[in-house]
Amino acid sequence: MDRSGQAGNTIIVVWSDHGFHLGEKEHIEKFALWEKANHVPLIIVDPRKPKSAGRVCSSPVDLTCLYPTLLDLCGLPAYPANDGLSVASQVSDPSRTIAKPALMTYGFGNHAVRTQRWRYIRYADGTEELYDHKNDPNEWNNLAGEKQYKKIIEEHAEWMPKTNAKPFENLR
């Protein structure tokens, strides 16, 4: 890009898949709402923001942020139908707080909400999981059944989708 003269005005975005589980939580596929199945790298480099170069934003985001963020960084109007929010302010200053938690969905009615500390999962059958990433980064201890976490569950449940899209036919 340096030779083309475009390095100074090209935003670079790199993200990746997470690969398969290799037996974690007795699971060998990648179709799950746990951290290992959803934590993927995301790198956004804006050459106009040199102060943030090489800095890491530790707040979880989901990939619905990509399109709104690129619109924002390019100075284009936001598209109101987008589910995601721009994280352009975190590209400029990675220490800034993200306005909403990351949301993941797998299958019909199965969702997870990930905040800095917690992952809350609610399945279509009503079962729940809650993990404290400060004390349990591998998500071995489901806290959802413990009364002292009721408020945390309620706060995270507010971010769950209110409606579900019809599933694709024959989707595994």
Regions found by a protein language model. Give the residues of each.
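Residue-level signal for alpha-helix termini/capping positions
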Residues: 2, 6, 92-95, 148
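C-terminal cap/loop subdomain of S1 sulfatases and analogous C-terminal strand-loop tails that border
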Residues: 18-27, 62-67, 71-133, 138, ...
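Histidine-centered active-site microenvironments of extracellular/periplasmic hydrolases
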Residues: 2-55, 99
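Active-site rim elements
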Residues: 29, 50-61, 73-78, 140-146
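An amphipathic, aromatic/His-enriched active-site/gating alpha helix that lines ligand/cofactor pockets
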Residues: 146, 150-153
